[in-house]
């Protein structure tokens, strides 16, 4: 939720943000009107209540002849106070509803436009070149007996898979590598719940335009999370945090679930776009004044992972119209996928400023002793999709895959992933 004071004092900023996103500006006008009605209703209620209290004192002091009249006036005022209180509550609810329809205010410099209007920040690394026809990740995975899409579909349906043998080991190694980097950077690891309450899912902004991508258990009224960001944001809901020693940082490891609604026909081959996957998510609670610096810190950690895995990648500043409702700015890190001849998103990091914290009631106490909403940020440090880039980038002509040096300690020192036929022949 955006700051109501910003809406009140600078509605032009909110309108400009909506225009950058290509979103409705009418909702801003509606929220401004609702805020005005709320303040008028509260003023009326407080005035009538003060009048009621004053009459109550007069009744206590009145002589016998005047008491019936004053009591009648008090009763009338009581009814008016009750009605005014109801109007104030209704106005408060209307404002809350209007405010929840306004996404976060984008940060200065975020490019305008939609999915294809991102700004390139940098390209890093040399794209893999081969003296043979490269295989895609699924063909490599089948040669290694590491990825089984057929049985995944048999057991669970389309966009499900098994990671088998070295495939399972590779994913666990990747996650442990990311976790080691998180610990090195001082993040506290958490294994998070994957089922959350509606108020937590709504508080993080995932029940807006993309609600159809979320799995819901109707009988229990719980949501399956598509990222541990949701649980990590809810972890300190309705709390006052102590940031005197600096930001509070977590690394959440969880299984994630996404419906991939609207993705029909996209990435149907392999494990680029699946319904279930593993993810290690960084999450920071910081003083809002430090949020942009923290965003750069998270991005630097992601880039270091890309470099240590030997992946060519680019960093883009996502356009406003392609941001989720909670994000004020989002950087995507996209790795080069040789067989697609394209960069594909492997990870992203978002600065949600105080948007989620306002919804979830997460505050911190400043130097002046007053409390105010914290800023929250998130970024992925490892996930299943990275296997795609690792297999394709480091493949060899015989179907084997060279293991990046940084990953070898997490695979028992293994230097090469060998085809299953070669292993069987030994």
Swiss-Prot record:
Q: Reaction(s) catalyzed by this protein?
A: tRNA(Ser) + L-serine + ATP = L-seryl-tRNA(Ser) + AMP + diphosphate + H(+); tRNA(Sec) + L-serine + ATP = L-seryl-tRNA(Sec) + AMP + diphosphate + H(+)
What family does the Swiss-Prot or TrEMBL record give for this protein? Belongs to the class-II aminoacyl-tRNA synthetase family. Type-1 seryl-tRNA synthetase subfamily.
Q: Report the protein's function.
A: Catalyzes the attachment of serine to tRNA(Ser). Is also able to aminoacylate tRNA(Sec) with serine, to form the misacylated tRNA L-seryl-tRNA(Sec), which will be further converted into selenocysteinyl-tRNA(Sec).
Its UniProt domain note says:
Consists of two distinct domains, a catalytic core and a N-terminal extension that is involved in tRNA binding.
Question: Can you say where in the cell this protein is located?
Answer: Cytoplasm
Listed InterPro entries:
aa-tRNA-synt_IIb, aa-tRNA-synth_II, aa-tRNA-synth_II/BPL/LPL, Ser-tRNA-ligase_type_1, Ser-tRNA-synth_1_N, SerRS_1_N_sf, SerRS_core, tRNA-bd_arm
| Flavoprotein listed as a keyword | no
* Protein name in UniProt: Serine--tRNA ligase
CDD domains attached here?
Answer: SerRS_core
Pfam families from the UniProt entry: Seryl_tRNA_N, tRNA-synt_2b
Protein source organism: Clavibacter sepedonicus (Clavibacter michiganensis subsp. sepedonicus)
> Sorted alphabetically, which PANTHER family does this protein's record hold?
SERYL-TRNA SYNTHETASE
EC number(s) given by UniProt = 6.1.1.11
Q: Name one GO biological process term.
A: seryl-tRNA aminoacylation
Oligomeric state and interaction partners are given as:
Homodimer. The tRNA molecule binds across the dimer.
Keyword annotations: Aminoacyl-tRNA synthetase, ATP-binding, Cytoplasm, Ligase, Nucleotide-binding, Protein biosynthesis
């Amino acid at each position: 939720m955006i700051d109501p004071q910003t809406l009140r004092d600078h509605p032009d900023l909110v309108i400009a943000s909506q225009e950058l996103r290509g979103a409705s500006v009418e909702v801003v006008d509606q929220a401004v009107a609702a805020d005005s009605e709320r303040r008028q209703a509260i003023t009326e209620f407080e005035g009538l209540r003060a009048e009621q209290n004053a009459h109550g004192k007069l009744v206590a002091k009145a002589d016998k002849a005047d008491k019936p009249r004053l009591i009648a006036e008090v009763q009338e005022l009581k009814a008016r106070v009750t009605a005014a209180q109801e109007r104030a509550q209704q106005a408060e609810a209307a404002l809350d509803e209007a405010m929840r329809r306004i996404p976060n205010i984008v940060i200065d410099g975020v490019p305008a436009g939609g999915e294809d209007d991102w700004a390139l920040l940098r390209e890093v690394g040399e794209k893999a070149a081969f003296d043979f026809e490269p295989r895609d990740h699924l063909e490599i995975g089948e040669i290694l007996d590491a990825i089984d899409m057929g049985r995944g579909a048999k057991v669970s349906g389309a966009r499900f898979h098994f990671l088998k043998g070295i495939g399972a080991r590779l994913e666990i190694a990747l996650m442990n590598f990311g976790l080691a980097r998180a610990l090195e950077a001082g993040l506290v690891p958490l294994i998070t719940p994957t089922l959350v309450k509606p108020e937590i899912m709504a508080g993080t902004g995932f029940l807006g335009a993309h609600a159809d991508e979320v799995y819901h258990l109707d009988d229990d009224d719980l949501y399956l999370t598509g990222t541990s960001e949701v649980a990590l944001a809810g972890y300190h809901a309705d709390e006052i945090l102590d940031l005197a020693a600096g930001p509070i940082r977590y690394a959440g490891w969880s299984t994630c679930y996404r419906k991939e609604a609207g993705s029909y026909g996209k990435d149907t081959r392999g494990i680029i776009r699946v319904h279930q996957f593993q993810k290690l998510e960084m999450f920071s609670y910081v003083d809002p004044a430090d949020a942009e610096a923290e965003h750069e810190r998270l991005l630097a950690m992601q880039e270091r992972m890309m470099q240590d895995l030997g992946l060519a990648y680019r960093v883009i500043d996502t356009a406003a119209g392609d941001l989720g409702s909670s994000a004020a700015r989002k950087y995507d890190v996209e790795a080069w996928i040789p067989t697609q001849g394209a960069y594909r998103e492997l990870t992203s990091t978002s600065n949600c400023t105080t948007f989620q914290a306002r919804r979830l009631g997460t505050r911190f106490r400043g130097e002046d002793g007053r409390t105010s909403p914290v800023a929250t940020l998130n970024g992925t440090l490892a996930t299943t999709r990275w296997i795609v880039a690792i297999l394709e980038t480091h493949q060899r002509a015989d179907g084997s895959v060279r293991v990046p040096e940084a990953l070898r300690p997490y695979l028992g020192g293994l230097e090469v992933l060998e085809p299953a036929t070669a292993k069987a022949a030994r």
